């Protein structure tokens, strides 16, 4: 037993490390090959593997650096998770939307794959099961921009209520879909099927209104996706960000410890971002202060 232990102890000094280094080298080669030759597919798999929004945002920035577009959700293209389209772009998945459940996602994708793309919002509400895709799901889809592929309406129109009416555009659309599905079910159950004189329900007219501002649109997007998809609030300040020597928050966090220790005394650093959280704290001497948490485009 002593001899076996001594032999294995000496063997383990090199065999264990070499075997692991070989395996890691092989995995690294596979990863590099996939990223170089199948960048869209590789990065969509990486995004699907991430468990929190900060890591997803980080890898979306990597996609941007690689020249790969990450597009918002689309009712005629999105799958459950991130997926690559025919152009090599990555499409945001319906599974990442708050308020859209598993049954709704399955119903939307299954119907689309079976009977083709949805022609417009009215075709959509006629075809999907409203027991699965309820009003809450529809609201989240609108907020996320999933219906932007239907150019007839912009997002604000779905929530606009005309003076003197009690329902907004989306509620009119939902009611239309319910009536059409009821008529379809009733016709199917008749002895002779669909009759030439079957009732026709006209599509409701959705009143025009002003579109949302960029800030409103982005805030709604972030509410349901966890991130800004169509742009960024700092897009209003592109000139300032470009010409005022702005330091990214990520870089500033890397060097701030050195600044505290006295390095680069007299040098000024400018950062620009959105304050996403503010914590109110108290010092040991009972002085109140606030600690903001800013975020820029790269964080």
Question: What are the functions of these language-model segments?
Answer:
Residues 1-291, 295-297:
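Noncatalytic, beta-rich nucleic-acid-contacting surfaces in large DNA/RNA-processing enzymes
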């Amino acid at each position: 037993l002593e001899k076996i232990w001594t032999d294995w102890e000496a063997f383990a000094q090199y065999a264990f490390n070499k075997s692991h280094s070989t395996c890691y080298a092989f995995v690294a080669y596979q990863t590099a090959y996939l990223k170089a030759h199948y960048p869209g597919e590789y990065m969509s798999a990486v995004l699907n593997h991430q468990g929190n929004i900060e890591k997803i945002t980080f890898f979306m920035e990597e996609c941007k650096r690689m020249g790969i577009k990450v597009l918002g959700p689309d009712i005629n293209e999105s799958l459950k998770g991130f997926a690559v389209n025919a152009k090599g772009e990555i499409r945001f998945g319906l599974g990442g939307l708050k308020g859209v459940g598993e049954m709704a996602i399955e119903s939307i994708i299954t119907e689309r794959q079976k009977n083709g793309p949805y022609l417009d919002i009215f075709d959509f509400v006629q075809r999907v099961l409203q027991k699965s895709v309820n009003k809450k799901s529809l609201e989240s889809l609108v907020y996320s921009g999933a219906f932007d592929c239907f150019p007839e309406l912009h997002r604000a129109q779905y929530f606009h209520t005309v003076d003197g009416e009690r329902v907004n555009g989306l509620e009119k659309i939902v009611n239309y879909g319910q009536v059409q599905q009821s008529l379809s079910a009733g016709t199917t159950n008749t002895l002779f099927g669909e009759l030439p004189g079957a009732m026709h329900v006209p599509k409701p007219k959705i009143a025009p209104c002003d579109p949302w501002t960029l800030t409103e649109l982005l805030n709604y997007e972030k509410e349901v996706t966890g991130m800004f998809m169509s742009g960024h609030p700092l897009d209003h300040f592109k000139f300032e960000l470009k010409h005022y020597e702005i330091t990214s928050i990520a870089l500033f966090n890397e060097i701030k410890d050195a600044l505290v220790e006295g390095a680069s005394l007299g040098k000024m650093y400018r950062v620009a971002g959105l304050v996403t959280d503010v914590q109110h704290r108290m010092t040991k001497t009972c002085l109140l202060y606030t600690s903001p948490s800013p975020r820029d485009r790269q964080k």
